[in-house]
Design a protein with these regions (language model features):
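Conserved catalytic cores of phosphodiester-cleaving nucleases, focusing on short active-site segments
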Residues: 30, 58-75
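Nucleic-acid nuclease catalytic cores
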Residues: 90-119
Length: 152
């Protein structure tokens, strides 16, 4: 790996590692969890053809507390959540177990966890800006200052 910041590396390079540090941090800090969603399915070159609610299946199911958990990582730049992922998360949150977003900051070496509905309030009340990925997909750019970090 070069000294280039992670977010500036090519997608193919980031794909090899994305989520690993954040998911390890989640597993170390939580109990009663089981892997639920996809973790870079090998050999599935057309994964992006699947419906969003399948592609964006939450990473974990947890029994105590009872919830679905989507884990994401961030560094110095804002957290970027694709609009299509937000739509899928809304579908998952409609099930009987609430959906939480669990965010690991490699910069802070700390985590934030927020219910999906609270995340939507953060986005709406703070007029979170939209951005565009190179391939044209829109995302919400959420400042780390808006997230409820552990111990704050």
């Amino acid at each position: 790996m070069t000294n280039q910041p992670f977010h500036q590396a090519s997608y193919n390079h980031r794909f090899q590692f994305m989520g690993d540090e954040a998911e390890t941090a989640f597993e170390e800090r939580n109990t009663q969890w089981a892997r639920f969603g996809f973790n870079r399915p090998e050999g599935m070159t057309k994964f992006h053809y699947l419906p969003h609610v399948i592609r964006y299946t939450p990473d974990y199911v947890q029994a105590d507390p009872t919830r679905l958990v989507e884990v994401m990582g961030m560094g110095k730049t804002p957290l970027k959540i694709k609009m299509e992922k937000i739509a899928a998360m809304q579908w998952w949150d409609g099930l009987e177990a609430p959906l939480y977003l669990w965010v690991w900051s490699s910069t802070r070496q700390n985590f934030a966890q927020v219910k999906f509905r609270e995340l939507m309030n953060i986005i709406n009340k703070n007029d979170v800006p939209l951005g565009n990925f190179a391939e044209g997909k829109k995302y919400f750019s959420i400042s780390s200052k808006l997230l409820p970090w552990d111990g704050d």
